[in-house]
Amino acid sequence: MPFTLGQRWISDTESELGLGTIVAMDARTVTLLFPSTGENRLYARSDSPVTRVMFNPGDTITSHEGWQLHIDEVKEENGLLVYVGTRLDTEETNVTLREVLLDSKLVFSKPQDRLFAGQIDRMDRFALRYRARKFQSEQYRMPYSGLRGQRTNLIPHQLNIAHDVGRRHAPRVLLADEVGLGKTIEAGMILHQQLLSGAAERVLIIVPETLQHQWLVEMLRRFNLRFALFDDERYTEAQHDAYNPFETEQLVICSLDFARRNKQRLEHLCDAEWDLLVVDEAHHLVWSTDAPSREYMAIEQLAERVPGVLLLTATPEQLGMESHFARLRLLDPNRFHDFEQFVEEQKNYRPVADAVAMLLAGNKLSNDELNRLGDLIGEQDIEPLLQAANSDRDDAQAARDELVSMLMDRHGTSRVLFRNTRNGVKGFPKRELHTVKLPLPTQYQTAIKVSGIMGARKSAEDRARDMLYPEQIYQEFEGDTGTWWNFDPRVEWLMGYLTSHRSQKVLVICAKATTALQLEQVLREREGIRAAVFHEGMSIIERDRAAAWFAEEDTGAQVLLCSEIGSEGRNFQFASNLVMFDLPFNPDLLEQRIGRLDRIGQAHDIQIHVPYLEKTAQSVLVRWYHEGLDAFEHTCPTGRAIYDSAYASLINYLAAPEETDGFDDLIKSCREQHEALKAQLEQGRDRLLEIHSNGGEKAQQLAQSIEEQDDDTNLIAFAMNLFDIVGINQDDRGDNLIVLTPSDHMLVPDFPGLPEDGCTITFERDVALSREDAQFITWEHPLIRNGLDLILSGDTGSSTISLLKNKALPVGTLLVELVYVVEAQAPKQLQLNRFLPPTPVRMLLDKNGNNLAAQVEFETFNRQLSAVNRHTGSKLVNAVQQDVHAILQLGETQIEKSARALIDNARREADEKLSGELSRLEALRAVNPNIRDDELAAIDSNRQQVLESLNQAGWRLDALRLIVVTHQ
């Protein structure tokens, strides 16, 4: 193309310079000035890497003065283009704009503009963009969005609760599973779904102080949710950044004590407009009709202001009826306002539970039983269902299941309370106790005597704590010169046990971090035993590395030495040997220790070893735990209640272990109390609630469906393709582990979610569960979601040129591959992507407008194409620009029909689903008062807004590829 002074061109290699103007030329060179940067470039005339910028009728352009022109006609005068059209700000027609007066800061965002301006992407980036659109659209439509990405075992009862609650508007529920069944994971799954769908954006978690780091770790490691931990120091710092410090973070964890201690702080918490509030250990909130505690009132204030509330608590039977009512009152004070009425109501659910038990038993029902069912579900004609359920027909079981479902809907608190028990959930191992009685060394005997004399004025509790850890007493007297590990028989026993079980992983827990550190040194120096240490003084990353080393099968640590606090929230199901080097002070901590191994997913029976020193508090406590509470070999829901009632007597025996008179009677009394309470709890079990919480067959199918999605080969191929194109280094470490590190030539300087020093990833759930340092990559992982956003929010891969070698077609034949996106704009909380996610529509048009996309599949076609360098590509585009423009206009005509069909289908699906959900809940409200008015109103409002947003849905061209046929 001939050059003329004043023409506008763009650099193929430096598009960031903007629009250039020819300011000088001679026989061999041409000089361009780029006004937006003030730079000049000198190019050879014969083969310069520049592209002429030419706009077409229908385009909108901007003048150097800032006003815009809609082009109606393009003229050429002396080699320069003159654009004629309508000025948008004044609506004046027949306005002319010479190309020399175009805005130099021109940004080409439309794919066709980028193509015509020579901004041509690599072919592999176009393919990645199309795949990203396709996979993103598919993922939005997947039925279990938000449940697939967490690093957890796929446990049916947990998935059932999370799936039910996570899809609700502003859920307000009580999670009351027995210990070890995963309430924290259930809460995390619910949060993950709500945050991923946009139903919630701001979350506050309030927990006891000792559990803050456990929650921080669990949310980050299992769900990739990065919470901020607020304490006094962080709160004071944040006051410099905002009037309300809590508005500086979206996801916050704080302790209950921190929340209630300061009136202004509580007001700030209440004013921070949270979407979800999570309260752990909610059974510690003391309430009575006359005198609710300050902690209870603080949470009550928050629960009144926050739409969604999750309370995690001990089982209702452990709490007692009044305490249980107090939790429900926090969730829905209008519904649960009268304790006496609540007690009466609970009694009335007994016939419902009995009816469900009859149906589940599978026996034929008597006339009386059929009549009772008819009375319980009186507002509907269920005669045909009753007949089917009581027959030998093939549909008998289906009829029974439907009747059970109808009865469940009428069950008082089943929508607000979820509770699973170990009896109702299979898959737990046995626990076997091995006690090892060891002599008390003379050094300890001396230290204890001296301590007794010096600490005569200490309280019984302080003396008891001292007596539990004699090594601490000895070390205090001896100082740095003390070496208790040289004579403590527990150390010798531990070394002997570990050397005789070299092939087995062993978890050792002791109360103090210093004990763990000293034991590690002794094991390493004396026996060369590989031991990892895990304590509260380590950072989360250091703990991860220690846990990962322990998890490695062949070259990993044989033993992990944990302190009491350091082990909180970490589970090591791959090990089944637990050594308690000392004993914790109360049964809750004992259960927490055993719970590190005793989880769902543990494949072996747990061997619990307790080496203890005679004539110390350890010998007293080991007997009380085992003989009085049976707390080693079985979970002990009665432990806290009995501990509280026996506390005064127990403390005295611990403080003076040599005084054994009456101790056998105490053990006997505690055992009787334990058996009585246990029987009482068993009798009070709410079978109906367990069935509802457990999910049964439906929950099993849910787990199976997600497990099948784990094996998605498309994800692995896409992720590796994404990392290649973004410029992330990948180092395969074997064992299904890959190390990702940033490179110097990435698409963006900082890839969101990729640490500076890199990270280890795996696509295998089992590997991720055993290797805490490896991130579990799914479609829901931030690395993949951020990668999709990075590609799709910019113009990466939106315009390219390829060659098709095909002798069946004439040389120079043109094809244009168009990728349109049909989408609707709406606030995230409407979750419009359930019905109409940004959906790609691919078209492959020839010169006559024939769409060949249905006959030519994308991946097959892509493999037949070869790339063109940018300079050659620009020349090709210039040569066929008019033809391409004509094909684009044909595409604009054809897309409307396909797009309208997608939008109409989405509207129909949304209307059916949301109207059906509303109708079901409205009908249910007649028989179950636990359906809240605000929930019904929210669903109705959501339905109207969704349909309105879908009415305004549209489409746009997202990417295009020009294909030229060649025979070479």
Swiss-Prot record:
Enzyme class: hydrolase
Residues the record lists as binding ATP: D177, E178, V179, G180, L181, G182, K183, T184
Any one GO BP annotation for this protein: regulation of DNA-templated transcription
Keyword Hydrolase (UniProt): yes
Coiled coil: none
Highest taxon, organism lineage: Bacteria
GO molecular-function term, one example from the UniProt record: DNA binding
InterPro entries with a match to the protein in the record: Helicase_ATP-bd, Helicase_C-like, Helicase_RapA, P-loop_NTPase, RapA_C, SNF2-like_sf, SNF2/RAD54-like_C, SNF2_N
Residue span(s) of domain Helicase ATP-binding: 164-334
Keywords: Activator, ATP-binding, DNA-binding, Helicase, Hydrolase, Nucleotide-binding, Transcription, Transcription regulation
SMART domains assigned to the protein according to its UniProt record, in alphabetical order: DEXDc, HELICc
Family statement: Belongs to the SNF2/RAD54 helicase family. RapA subfamily.
NCBIfam families: PRK04914.1
Function, as annotated: Transcription regulator that activates transcription by stimulating RNA polymerase (RNAP) recycling in case of stress conditions such as supercoiled DNA or high salt concentrations. Probably acts by releasing the RNAP, when it is trapped or immobilized on tightly supercoiled DNA. Does not activate transcription on linear DNA. Probably not involved in DNA repair.
Subunit structure: Interacts with the RNAP. Has a higher affinity for the core RNAP than for the holoenzyme. Its ATPase activity is stimulated by binding to RNAP.
Designated name of the protein: RNA polymerase-associated protein RapA
